[in-house]
From Swiss-Prot:
GO terms for biological process: translation. InterPro entries: Ribosomal_bS18, Ribosomal_bS18_CS, Ribosomal_bS18_sf. It comes from Caulobacter vibrioides (strain NA1000 / CB15N). GO terms for molecular function: small ribosomal subunit rRNA binding; structural constituent of ribosome. Coiled coil: none annotated. Belongs to the bacterial ribosomal protein bS18 family. The keyword rRNA-binding applies. Part of the 30S ribosomal subunit. Forms a tight heterodimer with protein bS6. Binds as a heterodimer with protein bS6 to the central domain of the 16S rRNA, where it helps stabilize the platform of the 30S subunit. This is Small ribosomal subunit protein bS18. SUPFAM superfamilies: Ribosomal protein S18. The gene is rpsR.
Length: 92
């Protein structure tokens, strides 16, 4: 009765001897911070529409990489534009 330490057939590549590199997620940078960053304005409908989904909902900052402070400004500008009928509340 001898024990063998051979890797099993269903073992991951790291156990077989080949080390796998960890997945590297690139850090997202806020598009509204920096020298040439656009100003958030409720009248700039073209800019605001990039941060509204096709159903009319505000896209979360984890998807758009907008900082928390700028996300609050963006949400306020979108809501103001909706109130003034520059943007629709819902899209059919």
């Amino acid at each position: 009765m001898t024990d063998t330490t051979a890797p099993e057939a269903g073992a991951p590549a790291a156990a077989a001897g080949g080390a796998r590199r960890p997945f590297f997620r690139r850090r997202k940078v806020c598009p509204f911070s920096g020298a040439n960053a656009p100003k958030i304005d409720y009248k700039d409908v073209k800019l605001l529409q990039r941060y509204v989904s096709e159903r009319g909902k505000i896209v979360p900052s984890r998807i758009t990489a907008v900082s928390a402070k700028k996300q609050r400004e963006l949400a306020k500008a979108i809501k103001r534009a909706r109130f003034l009928a520059l943007l629709p509340y819902v899209v059919k």
